[in-house]
């Protein structure tokens, strides 16, 4: 049965993003509500977001199983990827196609992300890298940027205790210096509080550029050469990899990349790290990406023969 709630005082997005009524009654579609519990979204900072109760994106604590969970029969544990990277694309288009405010597209996307993390945790994935905000996203309307910053802030505050309790480690890759100071402080707190956890490592790419990641690694190596610590002939791919921002994880190169919404590009994400990654492009918008779609991606991955540039056997 569809779930409805009131959205009060919709934030003033430009007309091209959404309409601006004072009160809208929204139907959350049955196929989405069956997968995850419905909760309202909290307002973002700077009064830029919709006034949806933040429980809309709260964690269903019963969904995390700290014991080993049997895999779906279609999957082999021996062939599971250790590290999955995700470009969570399509939140805005999902909302627009339904005549909903963009804020609800992101809210639905966060609910789906929670389910995705739950499944990854229960199915034994070791690392997730999530493309949350690119360095190019600053060019979006200020109201939308403020919304996203507020969402990052709210989710971190709400989930820090759960992350620590369930053994999930959080790391941030990207240039955090441009984020709001309060968000930077919260990120530092969350990273420190979870750094000893090892059940699942979640890397969130915020203000991230794959090109700049390589550039900053080269700058660091160049400085080491200048300081006389290494010679130019010491530079190799392993040394570069050790200076990339994904050096914080045990598995810096993803085994599988999933991109939703039917777009067939990398969008400046993990350009070095994806050299031998298997790619899976889903036609589903991110808010529609559920367990069935995740299972399809994993089955596709397990049917492939990874050659890393070599010949097939």
From Swiss-Prot:
Domain of life: Eukaryota
Family statement: Belongs to the UPP synthase family.
Compartment(s): Plastid, Chloroplast
InterPro entries attached to this UniProt entry: UPP_synth-like, UPP_synth-like_CS, UPP_synth-like_sf
Lineage, highest ranks first: Eukaryota, Viridiplantae, Streptophyta, Embryophyta, Tracheophyta
Gene3D superfamilies: Decaprenyl diphosphate synthase-like
Record's protein name: Dehydrodolichyl diphosphate synthase CPT5, chloroplastic
Listed GO CC annotations: chloroplast; chloroplast stroma
Catalytic activity: n isopentenyl diphosphate + (2E,6E)-farnesyl diphosphate = a di-trans,poly-cis-polyprenyl diphosphate + n diphosphate
Function: Catalyzes cis-prenyl chain elongation to produce the polyprenyl backbone of dolichol, a glycosyl carrier-lipid required for the biosynthesis of several classes of glycoprotein.
Parts of the chain that traverse the membrane: none
Transit pept. (range): 1-42
Active site: 89
Cofactor(s) this protein requires: Mg(2+)
Coiled coil: none
EC category name: transferase
């Amino acid at each position: 049965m569809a779930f409805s709630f009131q959205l009060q005082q919709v934030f003033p997005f430009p007309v091209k993003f959404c309409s601006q009524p004072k009160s809208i009654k929204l139907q959350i579609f049955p196929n989405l509500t069956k997968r995850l519990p419905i909760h309202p979204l909290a307002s973002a900072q700077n009064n830029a977001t919709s006034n949806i109760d933040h429980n809309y994106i709260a964690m269903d604590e019963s969904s995390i199983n700290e014991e080993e969970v049997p895999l779906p029969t279609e999957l082999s544990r021996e062939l599971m990827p250790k590290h999955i990277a995700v470009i969570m694309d399509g939140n805005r288009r999902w909302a627009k196609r339904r005549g909903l405010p963009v804020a609800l597209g992101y809210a639905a996307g966060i609910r789906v992300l929670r389910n995705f993390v739950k499944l990854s945790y229960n199915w034994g994935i070791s690392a997730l890298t999530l493309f949350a905000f690119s360095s190019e996203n600053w060019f979006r309307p200020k109201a939308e940027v403020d919304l996203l910053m507020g969402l990052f802030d709210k989710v971190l505050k709400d989930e820090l205790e759960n992350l620590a309790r369930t053994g999930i480690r959080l790391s941030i890759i990207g240039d955090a210096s441009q984020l709001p100071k309060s968000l930077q402080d919260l990120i530092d707190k969350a990273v420190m509080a979870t750094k000893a956890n090892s059940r699942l490592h979640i890397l969130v790419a915020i203000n991230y550029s794959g090109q700049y990641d390589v550039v900053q690694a080269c700058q660091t190596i160049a400085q080491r050469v200048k300081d006389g610590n290494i010679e130019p002939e010491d530079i190799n791919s392993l040394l570069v990899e050790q200076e990339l921002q994904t050096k914080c994880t045990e598995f810096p190169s993803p085994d599988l990349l999933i991109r939703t919404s039917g777009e067939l590009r990398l969008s400046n994400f993990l350009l070095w790290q994806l050299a031998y990654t298997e790619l899976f492009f889903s036609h589903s918008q991110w808010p529609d990406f559920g367990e069935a779609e995740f299972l399809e991606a994993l089955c596709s991955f397990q049917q492939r023969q990874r050659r890393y540039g070599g010949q097939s056997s």
